[in-house]
Structure formats: C-alpha cells, structure tokens
Amino acid sequence: ELLIPSIFPTISEDYERVYSDFAITSLCNEMEETIQLLSLQSQKDESLSFDKQQSSNVIDLKKMNKVWSTRFDQLPNNPGILLETLRIRSLVTDVTEMKPQWLRFIEVATNSKCVELSQQTLDYLSEKGMKDDPDLHILKAKLLWSQGNDFKSKAIKYLKQNVDESNPNYYFILGKWFQEEGEYKKAREKVSKAT
C-alpha cells in the first residue's frame, strides 16, 4: 500500500518511469491472492464432506484462474515479469492448467535470446508431465533454430522427428524457416501443405 500513492499520480505523467513500481505492486497483489487461495485449498483438504463451502472454494479457484489468465495475457513480453508471475501462480495452480502461459513464456524467452532459461523451462515442463506434448517439441525446435546457423539443421531434424505432420503448425514453421533462409520455393511448398 505504500507504493500506491507514489505510483498513481505519476502514471499519467510517465508510465515508463513507474512501471517497475507498478510491476512490484502487481506481484505483491498476486502473492496476496495466492495466499488466499492456499488458505482455501487447505480448508478444502481439511473438510471431509463436499458441502456448500467446499463447492464455493472450487468456484473461487476457477474464477481466480480465469482472472489470472486474463491478466497474464495483458503482461508485456518481458521474460522476467512473466516468470515471476508464473512462479507465484504455480504455488496453487498445476502446470498443465497454465500450459498456454508457460508456452508464451518460453516463446518470449526464446525471442529475447534467453536460451538457457528457455531450455530449463522446457526441461521443467517435461518433468511435470508434458514430456510428449507436441507444443513443447515445437518450442524446443524453435529454440534450436534461434541459436543460429549451427543449430538450424538440428532444429529441422528435431521438428520432423518429434512433431507429427498432421499438426497444423508443422508446415507453417518449416515454411517460415525456409523463407528466412531465402528458399522461397521450399517455403511455398510447405505452407501450401498446411492450408
């Protein structure tokens, strides 16, 4: 609450200057909500019968997850902010329930050249039961591609070995990569197979 008076008068004047304070305040708010949800979950675990209170707790958790998803969509493409937000939320929400948010984070981290962070996150999600997820394999291939010429053939090979051709993104990704390499005929062939 101490940050609020310093933030709001200056937001209209200089958003960039107060953004870090605003981000800290938002993370504190998320931590408070997480603590409340942990409290609700412990109440649910202590209750042996499925009564109205427990039903209300489940509804509250679903509502909060929906609110969090909407908020996450509005966050800037900053790997640090996205990661801190995901770390807080993962205290109460299963990784598989936050799959779109984790995938966005990996994409942003890869585009920001945070190779090690992207790889660690891919490994973490694999350990959490998403090892065979085709979206994870696509991001792994994109991560390889982003590492430069020495890794591009590995990226194509990895994509072909781990992602089924029936996946709607398979040919689009290959087409995009061939286009980046100036191989327009191959790019056109791949994209035409996707449509």
For each feature predicted by the language model, list its residue ranges:
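Extended alpha-helical assembly domains of large eukaryotic scaffold proteins
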Residues: 1-195
